[in-house]
Amino acid sequence: MSDPLFDAEDDAATPLTPEEREGLIPTYITLRHELNEAEQIGIEEADRWAFGRKRDVLDERFLTALHKRMFGQVWRWAGQYRTTGRNIGVDAYRIGMDLHQLLDDVRYWVAHGTYGADEVAVRFHHRLVAIHPFPNGNGRHARLAADLLAVQLGAARLTWGRANLVEPKETRQAYVTALRAADDHDIAPLLAFART
């Protein structure tokens, strides 16, 4: 049976388990567009919070706090690592270890000038999405975290196609295609998309 709230609108969306679905806080939400709107309000508030303070994006506690700020008014599990398998991401038991390795790698890239600011931020974003630490909201969380990192490194915010990447439209498909190219070790399409 179809569920207008939780059925994936495209094959790149992360499905939630029944237990995760029970974590929905607002009782008025019955349709996908209502969920998207409620989440967007939290994302905008988290954006103002994160850019309005001193922060270290490469701190695990900051990243979990950022996710909680983004989705905490909508989902009880916001800011908590997922505990179940997914169609994307590392095994749940590896999330903490892989995230720690990512943060160490990014610190190394920055300290040794391995990549420019944009490429550091985009590679950080890609790896964060690939880890997929949370039940949902990973792409939006990783884009905001990458924006924060770019600014922390002295660059401008990334533009990510200048469109809503939640809706399954042409721009979202270009983003997903660029992520998949990065999965195959071709970062150029994602780097280009991040500045379009």
Per-region residue spans from a language model:
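FIC/Doc superfamily catalytic core
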Residues: 1-196
